[in-house]
Amino acid sequence: MDDANVPSLSGLPLLGAADRADPLFRRTAALAWSDRNPYFFAGAAARGIGGPHIGLDMIWPMSIVTHAMNSDDDAVIRQCLTWLKTTHGGTGFMHESFHKDDPTKFTRPWFAWANTLFGELVLDIVRRKSKLM
């Protein structure tokens, strides 16, 4: 099981604890982003990891951010950006979590931790994949 928070197994490269290209990390991330993780959810709005604190079917945007930051695949990064742009529930901010099928059902209308991590993602993409911005 992996949780959406950072630090998490999915966020190890962000902490410098693993290289995102390391085969062991890649397998760990693939497991976390699969149905084998009881807190991985896929719905009409997005796919991502949640956690036991909020309940089932609630995706944390932080998990989508870390997924994008751990990827070198332009299509994966674009998909993550699309999910992040379309799941703010009309507020323009990242939330703690949102429902996998209905992003207007969310927790915390403004969540500084997720907003800050999203800012880190923007800087990361500008440095690594500026053509995607």
Regions found by a protein language model. Give the residues of each.
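Extended ligand-binding clefts on enzyme/binding-domain cores
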Residues: 1-63, 70-72
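CBM-like carbohydrate-recognition segments
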Residues: 51-133
